[in-house]
Amino acid sequence: MAKFATQLLLFVLIASLVMLEVHASNTFQVPDLGKRLLMNRDPNGFPCAESCVYIPCTVTALLGCSCRNRVCYRNEL
């Protein structure tokens, strides 16, 4: 009887892990960059990964970025 109980417990644990994996894979989806940009629209434009707290936009100015609210932004199209 103890062997049967051990096998049943092992089966239930494995089945639980499989079901957890199936449910987790269906709900976990990373949105692509386009969706993230559309969902998090900033009225200033797109951040250029440079701040302009003490020094104005230097490297990203070549890409068309300008300083607004102490962050370098590129105007939206």
From Swiss-Prot:
GO terms for biological process: defense response. Coiled coil: none annotated. SUPFAM superfamilies: Cyclotides. Disulfide bonds join C48-C65, C52-C67, C57-C72. The keyword Disulfide bond applies. There is a cross-link at G45-N75 (Cyclopeptide (Gly-Asn)). Residues 1-24 form the signal peptide. Expressed in fruit and pedicel but not in root, leaf and stem (at protein level). Keywords: Disulfide bond, Knottin, Plant defense, Signal. It comes from the Eukaryota. The presence of a 'disulfide through disulfide knot' structurally defines this protein as a knottin. This is Chassatide C13. It comes from Chassalia chartacea.
